[in-house]
């Protein structure tokens, strides 16, 4: 169950949005960035973005998170309506402390999957049930999801969300994230077309 906590206008370089904050049963706060009025609409463009302090905020080149976030906000800013659900699930759900431990193992040659497993952690422990609850809160009838991750789509469908299609996100690989993106494609099944 989720509870709306607050909302306010959010002017950005990508356009005017509204930010909503919700609290879930685990007392975790999540943000929903809304463009226009998607309530009760069909074919709503949606991005579900998991928190990434190193990429989103610090501009790390180890991942493509910031690219995906910026591309999504830019895309949504050109739409009549749409949503970005920002989930507090740092490091595919393992948290910031463990994510930095995993980075250390990656510095020694492990890929992102191997690093999590060496730490005794799940490869991906994210949960998208909160996102499904948000979509129900806004009475969204159907979505087009901006993602390369088929597990997100599967999870939403299993939660009863009508997913009409996928909007791919393209990132130009850098020397720092090429191995990471290749691993996401080969080991996690991400649909990354330019790797």
Curated annotation (Swiss-Prot):
* Name the UniProt record assigns to this protein: GTP cyclohydrolase-2
Family matches, as NCBIfam families = PRK00393.1, ribA
Residues in the signal sequence: none
What is this protein's function?
A: Catalyzes the conversion of GTP to 2,5-diamino-6-ribosylamino-4(3H)-pyrimidinone 5'-phosphate (DARP), formate and pyrophosphate.
> What gene is this protein a product of?
ribA
Q: Which residues bind Zn(2+)?
A: 52, 63, 65
EC number, as in UniProt: 3.5.4.25
The entry assigns this protein to a family as follows: Belongs to the GTP cyclohydrolase II family.
Q: Does the keyword rRNA-binding apply?
A: no
Entry cofactors: Zn(2+)
A Pfam family found in this protein is: GTP_cyclohydro2
Q: Where does GTP bind?
A: 47-51, 68, 90-92, 112, 147, 152
**What's in the keyword line of the UniProt record?**
GTP-binding, Hydrolase, Metal-binding, Nucleotide-binding, Riboflavin biosynthesis, Zinc
User: What's in the GO CC field?
Assistant: cytosol
List, alphabetically, the InterPro entries matched.
Answer: GTP_cyclohydro_II, RibA, RibA-like_sf
Native organism: Thermoplasma volcanium (strain ATCC 51530 / DSM 4299 / JCM 9571 / NBRC 15438 / GSS1)
> Tell me, what is one Gene Ontology molecular-function annotation carried by this entry?
GTP cyclohydrolase II activity
Q: Which GO terms describe its biological process?
A: riboflavin biosynthetic process
CDD domains per record:
GTP_cyclohydro2
Q: Which reaction does it catalyse?
A: GTP + 4 H2O = 2,5-diamino-6-hydroxy-4-(5-phosphoribosylamino)-pyrimidine + formate + 2 phosphate + 3 H(+)
- What pathway does the annotation place this protein in? Cofactor biosynthesis; riboflavin biosynthesis; 5-amino-6-(D-ribitylamino)uracil from GTP: step 1/4
Which principal EC class is assigned to this enzyme?
hydrolase
Q: How is the cofactor bound?
A: Binds 1 zinc ion per subunit.
Catalytic-site annotation from UniProt? 124 (proton acceptor), 126 (nucleophile)
């Amino acid at each position: 169950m989720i509870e709306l906590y607050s909302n306010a206008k959010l002017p950005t370089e990508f356009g005017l949005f509204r930010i909503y904050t919700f609290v879930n049963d685990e007392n975790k706060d999540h943000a929903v960035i809304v463009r226009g009025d998607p309530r009760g609409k069909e074919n709503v463009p949606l991005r579900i973005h998991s928190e990434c302090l190193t990429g989103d905020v610090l501009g790390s080149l180890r991942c493509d998170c910031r690219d995906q976030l910026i591309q999504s906000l830019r895309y949504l800013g050109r739409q009549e309506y749409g949503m970005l659900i920002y989930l507090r699930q740092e490091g595919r759900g393992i948290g910031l402390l463990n994510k930095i431990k995993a980075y250390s193992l990656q510095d020694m040659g492990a890929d992102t999957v191997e690093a999590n497993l060496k730490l005794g952690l799940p490869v991906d422990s994210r949960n998208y049930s909160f996102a499904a609850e948000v979509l129900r809160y806004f009475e969204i009838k159907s979505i087009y999801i901006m993602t390369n991750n088929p597990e997100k789509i599967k999870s939403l469908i299993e939660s009863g969300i009508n997913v009409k299609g996928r909007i791919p996100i393209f990132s130009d690989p850098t020397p720092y994230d090429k191995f990471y993106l290749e691993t996401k494609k080969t080991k996690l099944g991400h649909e990354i077309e330019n790797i």
